[in-house]
A protein has these predicted regions:
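Active-site helix of classical SDR
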Residues: 129, 166, 174
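Canonical Rossmann dinucleotide-binding motif of NAD(H)/NADP(H)-dependent dehydrogenases/reductases
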Residues: 3-41
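Residue(s) in the substrate-gating loop at a strand-loop-helix junction
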Residues: 150
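Alpha-helical segment proximal to the catalytic Tyr-Lys
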Residues: 134, 179-183, 237
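Substrate-binding pocket helix/loop in short-chain dehydrogenase/reductase
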Residues: 105-106, 110-118, 209-210
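C-terminal helical subdomain
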Residues: 190, 206-239, 244-248, 270-272, ...
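Active-site loop immediately N-terminal to the catalytic Tyr-X3-Lys motif
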Residues: 23, 107, 155-161, 183, ...
Length: 280
């Protein structure tokens, strides 16, 4: 039997709250790590959503803790990581799942949309990388950082200029931090999903290209969680600075969002996500 080396490990997952009607990457990642034997602190801006994920963890016999924090605020990120480390009595794995997007023709992207998109997808990732690295370095025992990137960060996608630029920044941040922190035994990797096949029922079907662009079909949230599990585990003990595409093969087929998508469909998708995107 293969030992993943996660039994008794201590993990933090940001963006782990369970949103009603959406499976969510964060929820799946937190539960999957717990199933592998890790104790998991679930961080979300809404403590109730974090507690919902902890309930799922407890149902599978795992150990979880809920923690509320605004991960878009650097001081609150530092505070939350400190509390999480106290809860767990240390830290071995830190996973960043926070992110958000909207679709806009590039010439229509406002300064506000650009700045918010970078804040949600790149700046907050930097905050969490920095905070977790300080704890890992102080411990002196190494650790694993895993971030959620995107296929849009490695290839072009229409109407995603801001999001693609932010996720490309995440991919580069992963490489830079992996290079700098390797001497401390800290591994830094990323998982880049494409269009996920479940957990996104409120996203209009018309935004996505037909299934034929996915040779292996669209990935599930569990597929994303499995990739995170690999990077967090001892199986990836000599893997760092990498971003793994989990997209059903879409990236090698080219863009998966139709360049001729109707703007009203795009606007419907933006409206569906605005409850999370527009809170600042």
């Amino acid at each position: 039997m293969i030992d993943l080396g996660l039994t008794g490990k201590r993990a933090v997952v940001s963006g782990a709250g369970r949103i009603p009607g959406r499976a969510g990457h964060g929820t799946k990642v937190a539960v999957t790590l717990a199933e592998a034997g890790a104790s998991v602190v679930c961080i979300d801006v809404d403590e109730g959503r974090a507690r919902s994920t902890v309930e799922l963890i407890e149902r599978v016999g795992g150990t979880g803790y809920a923690l509320a924090a605004d991960m878009l605020d650097s001081s609150d990120v530092d505070r939350a990581l400190g509390e999480a480390v106290s809860m767990l009595d240390g830290l071995d794995v830190c996973v960043d799942i926070i992110g958000n997007t909207r679709w806009d023709q590039t010439e229509d992207v406002t300064d506000d949309v650009w700045n918010r998109t970078l804040l949600f997808n790149l700046t907050q990732a930097f905050y969490l990388f920095r905070a977790s690295s300080r704890h890992f370095i102080a411990q002196g025992t190494g650790g694993s950082i895993v971030a959620l990137a995107s296929v849009d960060g490695v290839s072009a996608s229409p109407f995603h200029a801001a999001y693609g630029a932010a996720k490309a920044g995440v991919v580069h941040l992963i490489k830079t931090c992996a290079d700098e922190w390797g001497r401390h035994g800290i591994r830094v990797n990323g998982v880049a999903p494409g269009a996920v096949g479940d957990g996104n029922d409120d996203q209009p079907d018309g935004v996505w290209a037909p299934d034929p662009v996915h040779p292996l079909a669209r990935p599930r949230n569990q597929d994303i969680a499995n990739a995170v599990l690999f990077f967090a585990s001892d199986l990836a003990a000599r893997v760092t600075g990498q971003t793994l595409l989990v997209d059903g093969g879409a990236q090698m087929k080219g863009t998966y969002i139709r360049a001729d998508a109707q703007l009203d469909v795009m606007n419907d998708a933006n409206a569906a996500m605005s409850v999370y995107y527009d809170r600042r």
